[in-house]
């Protein structure tokens, strides 16, 4: 049993980082005068930044403002206080102002500001042929599609302040993912959409693993997304799993990293057995492998 789990973890590691198994090199920005570091793979649209408070008893709270959103890091949030910041896939390249305020236990305040340079990111384009009912649903299904979209947004809008994850994130399948995050998809040569996740092709029925520990906040069957699972990992981080053939969890379940939550399928707007795996951080659509790259152990 232990050997089987070790092999599975090894395969997932290879899927994430290749046969070499090396985690990509991280970049770090240390904030002068404030015990905080910003860790990230790249400063590009679709990337994830980790803002961590370092060990310093004299600072009780840090406020971070980036891209129009304010984040609070409080020492009371756990043994590893920090926040995840997502750079949405639609973010324009160019300057992005980082403002950091450190509140000390004696009441004094330290302030730091820096202009970060967001590099451009190129996305691919793909033409896809699907059944017309997946582009223009029958009248009886249009209300269902809207209701499901509203439900998904409502679920993603509820943020859990505590961190529920266990160490670093892992891919949900051992198979290698397509490099199609942010892809501009044109269906039947007339309807376009942006692909806000990555696709992983795998045999029908292959077990899908939870990419980290958390609470199942949605497990349902959607018209376009097929059978889906959404896991809340806390602190605004959600993982999404679409087009499954079978769900192995239900809403309200607490799952551990690596647990089987579903099976690969071809449900919804899909052209073959695969898993759509997405990550949302607050309102930002980010590359799942940017989150996997972060060293959270």
Question: What are these model-predicted stretches?
Answer:
Residues 6-16:
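Bacterial N-terminal signal peptides
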Residues 23-115, 120:
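Cationic-aromatic interfacial patches
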Residues 68, 98, 177, 200, ...:
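Terminal peptide-recognition signature
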Residues 112-225:
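Surface-exposed, glycine-biased beta-strand/turn segments
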Residues 196, 211-248, 273-278:
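Zn2+-dependent peptidoglycan hydrolase active-site motif and core
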Residues 207-217, 249-264:
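Short, well-structured beta-strand-loop connectors
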Residues 229-232, 253-297:
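Conserved, short, structured surface segments that act as functional micro-motifs
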């Amino acid at each position: 049993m232990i050997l089987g789990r070790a092999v599975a973890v090894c395969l997932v590691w290879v899927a994430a980082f290749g046969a070499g198994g090396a985690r990509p090199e991280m970049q770090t920005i240390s904030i002068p005068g404030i015990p905080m570091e910003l860790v990230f793979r790249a400063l590009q649209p679709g990337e994830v930044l980790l803002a961590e408070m370092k060990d310093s008893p004299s600072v009780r709270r840090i406020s971070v403002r980036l891209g129009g959103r304010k984040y609070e890091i409080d020492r009371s949030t756990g043994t590893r206080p920090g926040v995840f910041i997502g750079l949405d896939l639609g973010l324009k390249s160019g300057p992005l102002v980082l403002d950091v305020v450190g509140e000390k236990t004696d009441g004094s305040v330290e302030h730091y500001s820096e202009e970060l340079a967001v590099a451009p990111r190129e996305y691919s384009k793909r033409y896809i042929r699907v059944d017309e009912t997946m582009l223009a649903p029958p009248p009886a299904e249009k209300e269902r599609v809207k209701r499901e979209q509203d439900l998904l947004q409502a679920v993603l809008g509820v943020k859990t302040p505590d961190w529920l994850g266990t160490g670093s994130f892992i891919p949900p399948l051992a198979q290698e993912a397509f490099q199609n995050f942010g892809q501009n998809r044109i269906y039947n040569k007339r309807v376009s959409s942006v692909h806000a996740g990555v696709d992983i092709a795998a045999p029908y029925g292959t077990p899908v693993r939870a990419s980290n520990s958390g609470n199942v906040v949605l497990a349902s069957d959607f018209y376009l997304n097929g059978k889906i699972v959404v896991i809340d990992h806390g602190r605004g981080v959600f993982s999404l799993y679409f087009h499954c053939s079978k769900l192995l969890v239900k809403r309200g379940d607490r799952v551990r990293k690596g647990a089987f939550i579903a099976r690969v399928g071809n449900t919804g707007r899909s052209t073959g057995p695969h898993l759509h795996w997405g990550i949302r951080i607050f309102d930002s659509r980010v590359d799942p492998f940017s989150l996997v790259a972060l060293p959270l152990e």
